[in-house]
């Protein structure tokens, strides 16, 4: 049990929102956090496509399977970016977006992990060097693992989507 004083020493209330409705505030904040996290899966590196980066590293000799995987991530990233824009427009128009943040957060973090996995694999064992030619790539790749925990784990996001978006039973 945690005890929080009702007021600070300067007399300002410690209560955010309504008393005994703290979970409502927490859910709102998590939704906001998830929306921000979801954007990470839609970015490209320095404005260049994943396929272009990987092709350069392979000296133009990227195999077709790897090229197809890179293009799938790029196409999925574009689809998520467009979906995020649609939900943003809906929110600005005063329409509810439901539990879209859970879906977008899950898809965004998974795409981010896929993108970094491909970039690591294209660099071979050299990409694992912490201070090597690939710069922050190893740290960025490891960071993607934390993204799937922030704002609610991927498993929690899948549970929210299955129950509240798709209406599936527990």
Can you name each region flagged by the protein language model?
Residues 1-81, 147:
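Glycine-rich beta->alpha junctions and the first turn(s) of the following alpha-helix
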Residues 2, 9-11, 108, 154-155, ...:
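Short, glycine-/Ser/Thr-/acidic-enriched flexible segments
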Residues 20, 50, 98, 103, ...:
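Active-site lining segments that contact anionic ligands and/or coordinate catalytic metals
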Residues 20-32, 36-42, 123-170:
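Glycine-rich phosphate/cofactor-binding loops in nucleotide/flavin-utilizing enzymes
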Residues 27, 47-55, 71, 81-88, ...:
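Predominant activation on well-ordered alpha-helical scaffold segments within soluble catalytic domains
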Residues 34, 57, 88-91, 95, ...:
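Short amphipathic alpha-helical interaction patches enriched in hydrophobic/aromatic residues
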Residues 57, 74, 91, 122-123, ...:
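Generic structural signal for hydrophobic core residues of well-folded globular domains
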Residues 64-67, 78-132:
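C-terminal helix-coil-helix/basic helical segment that borders enzyme active sites and/or dimer interfaces
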């Amino acid at each position: 049990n945690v005890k929080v004083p009702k007021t600070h020493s300067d007399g300002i209330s410690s209560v955010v929102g309504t008393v005994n409705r703290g979970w409502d505030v927490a859910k709102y904040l998590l939704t906001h956090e998830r929306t921000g996290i979801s954007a990470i899966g839609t970015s490209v590196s320095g404005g260049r496509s994943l396929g272009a980066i990987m092709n350069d590293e392979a000296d133009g000799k990227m195999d077709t399977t790897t090229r197809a995987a890179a293009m799938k991530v790029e196409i999925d990233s574009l689809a998520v970016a467009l979906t995020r824009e649609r939900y943003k427009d809906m929110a600005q128009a005063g329409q509810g977006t439901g539990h879209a943040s859970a879906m977008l957060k899950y898809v965004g973090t998974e795409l981010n992990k896929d993108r970094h996995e491909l970039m690591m694999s294209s660099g071979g064992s050299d990409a694992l060097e912490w201070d090597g030619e690939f710069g922050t790539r190893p740290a960025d790749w490891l960071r993607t693992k934390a993204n799937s925990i922030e704002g609610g784990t991927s498993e929690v996001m899948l549970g929210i989507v299955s129950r509240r978006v798709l209406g599936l039973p527990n």
